């Protein structure tokens, strides 16, 4: 990809001396692309003393573990994967998401569309391909589900509403949930976990960390089902519409919220050889998705013309 000079506005972060620690191993391009006003360790901190919306975030994950199981995911597949709810352009969809704030995110209070611009602009400045910049912009667009979802399905569109089937860290359903998930104390509330423990008691050979009999070893993540939300919806939407993205882009869309996999090293026994290649791209994307989160608003008017040329 050839990066051209332009007059687009960009972020100029002025890091504190404390925040500079931990960034020393990043390249110059990377340092220009992340929010250095916070230390790396200050992102994704799920503690009441550091998170203004801690109770909302905590309740989100409690609900997510309680209600997100294999049967729920299958029901959402049937309900939403006909893709017949509406027809709109990307920019019309963004307008619908204009006031949507993710209730599961401890790092940012801005509407999701603004985070999309933050991510895309950071990827552009780092010199990554056009397709990755575009994925950065739309990676959370699946949250448009709130227009058709029900509160009982965890699909409210308000910042303090029930969003447990729209956003948040995902995991593979139908098998025990890893203890490396955020708020692991809620894992025992999950129907899949309850079922797995019952099987373990009956057979005495299935414990946490085993993937049980639902998935074969090295079956590939494309054959697994994940906790339902914006990732899965957008992934299936792109496939349904035969969008011309490379496999790496589709993997980013589907797996970017699965922190147990791309950050904590879980599910390695389910991965195919190709998944190891895709993992590197998801991890690369995650740096821009996570470390650009900042309540400094991007200039979307200035950035939009460039995005439209991608």
Across the structure, where does each feature detected by a protein language model lie?
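Non-catalytic interface/linker regions that flank or bridge core catalytic/transmembrane domains
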Residues: 1-88, 92, 99
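Sparse, context-dependent recognition of short Cys/His-centered cofactor- or disulfide-binding micro-motifs
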Residues: 39, 46, 65, 82, ...
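Generic secondary-structure transition motif, activating predominantly at the C-termini of alpha-helices
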Residues: 58-61, 65-68, 80-84, 98-101, ...
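Active-site flanking loop/helix segments enriched in acidic
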Residues: 77-114, 214-221
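Divalent metal-dependent catalytic cores for phosphoryl transfer on phosphate-bearing substrates
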Residues: 108-302
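Ser/Thr/Pro-rich, acidic low-complexity intrinsically disordered regulatory segments
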Residues: 302-310
């Amino acid at each position: 990809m050839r990066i051209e000079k332009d007059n687009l506005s960009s972020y100029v972060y002025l890091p504190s001396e404390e925040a500079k620690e931990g960034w020393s191993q990043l390249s110059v391009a990377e340092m220009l692309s992340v929010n250095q006003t916070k230390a790396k360790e200050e992102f994704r901190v799920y503690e009441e003393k550091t998170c203004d919306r801690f109770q909302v975030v905590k309740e989100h994950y409690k609900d997510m573990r309680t209600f997100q199981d294999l049967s729920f995911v299958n029901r959402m597949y049937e309900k939403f994967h006909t893709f017949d709810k509406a027809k709109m352009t990307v920019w019309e969809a963004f307008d619908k998401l204009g006031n949507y704030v993710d209730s599961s995110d401890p790092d940012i209070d801005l509407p999701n569309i603004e985070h999309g611009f933050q991510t895309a602009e950071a990827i552009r400045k780092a010199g990554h391909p056009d397709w990755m910049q575009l994925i950065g912009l739309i990676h959370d667009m699946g949250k448009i589900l709130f227009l058709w979802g029900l509160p009982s399905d965890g699909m409210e569109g308000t910042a303090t509403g029930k969003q447990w089937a729209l956003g948040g860290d995902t995991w593979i359903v139908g098998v025990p949930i890893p203890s490396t998930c955020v708020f692991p104390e809620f894992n025992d509330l999950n129907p899949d976990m309850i079922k797995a423990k019952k099987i373990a008691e009956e057979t005495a050979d299935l414990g946490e960390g085993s993937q049980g009999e639902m998935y074969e070893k090295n079956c590939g993540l494309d054959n697994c089902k994940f906790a339902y939300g914006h990732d899965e919806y957008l992934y299936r939407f792109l496939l349904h519409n035969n969008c011309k993205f490379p496999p790496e882009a589709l993997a980013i869309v589907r797996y970017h919220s699965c922190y147990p996999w791309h950050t904590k090293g879980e599910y390695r026994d389910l991965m195919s050889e190709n998944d190891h290649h895709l993992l590197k791209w998801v991890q690369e994307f995650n740096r821009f998705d996570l470390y650009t989160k900042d309540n400094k608003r991007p200039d979307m008017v200035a950035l939009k013309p460039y995005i439209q040329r991608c």
